[in-house]
């Protein structure tokens, strides 16, 4: 597929380029350019980014970094079955667990909340870094809601990290918790937590302030 001439592949981080060294020089350049295009288009044209992900994986299917990039591109484009396939492959190759929350969310997207919960309860989850651990909580709570288990969703999100105000995931966690409370019919508590969420949301990425006043 067509790639702009100005995209050279040199734009990739050195650590990613280093993982392409096992490829021939010509193939490495092709793959690198496709990976750059994923980054270029992932926000503005996720379907095009996904196509570049497919192309990159076609040229370098044995490299975890390539399969993972293709998986994330497919996920952002809403192609959950493909995303799950690519992320599973990357996980098998590298053993890296950081993509487990996205894999669980893919299962939700495919209408498999029980599979999402099974993944959320797997022993490997204990190896997640804190941001991914929080993301897995949010995904698991969503799976509970998919099953109609609204109180269980609240319980899933109840954790000491709700008091955190500085980490990048704090806003998402508080919002998910407030939304779960609201869905469970606990309106007063939900408003309180939407207000706490709004305190962190200075740039108004969410509608927390509005929902706190409902």
Language-model segments: residues:
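Structural register within alpha-helical repeat arrays
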Residues: 37, 69-70, 103, 140, ...
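Short, small-residue-biased leader/transition segments that mark boundaries at the very start
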Residues: 1-3
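Alpha-helical segment of the N-proximal tetratricopeptide repeat
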Residues: 11, 22-58, 69, 75
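TPR/TPR-like (Sel1-like) alpha-helical repeat modules
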Residues: 93-96, 125-126, 155-161, 182-206, ...
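Generic helix N-cap/helix-start motif at coil->alpha-helix transitions
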Residues: 26-34, 49, 60-67, 94-102, ...
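Structural motif corresponding to the intra-repeat A-B loop/turn of tetratricopeptide repeats
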Residues: 42-44, 77, 110, 147, ...
């Amino acid at each position: 597929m067509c790639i702009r001439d100005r995209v050279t592949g040199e734009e990739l981080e050195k650590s990613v380029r280093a993982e392409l060294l096992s490829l021939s020089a010509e193939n490495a350049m092709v793959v690198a350019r496709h990976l750059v295009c994923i980054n270029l288009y992932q926000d503005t044209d996720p379907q095009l980014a996904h196509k570049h992900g497919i192309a990159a994986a076609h040229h370098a299917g044995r490299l975890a970094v390539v399969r993972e990039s293709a998986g994330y591109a497919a996920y952002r484009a809403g192609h959950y079955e493909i995303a799950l396939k690519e992320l599973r492959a990357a996980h098998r190759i590298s053993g890296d667990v950081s993509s487990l929350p996205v894999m669980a969310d893919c299962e939700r997207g495919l209408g498999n909340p029980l599979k999402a919960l099974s993944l959320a309860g797997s022993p490997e989850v204990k190896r997640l870094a804190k941001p991914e651990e929080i993301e897995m909580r949010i995904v698991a709570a969503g799976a509970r809601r998919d099953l109609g288990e609204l109180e269980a969703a609240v319980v899933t999100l109840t954790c000491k990290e709700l008091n955190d105000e500085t980490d990048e995931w704090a806003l998402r966690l508080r919002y998910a918790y407030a939304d779960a409370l609201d869905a469970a019919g606990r309106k007063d508590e939900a408003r309180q937590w939407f207000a706490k969420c709004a305190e962190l949301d200075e740039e108004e990425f969410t509608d927390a302030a509005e929902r706190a006043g409902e």
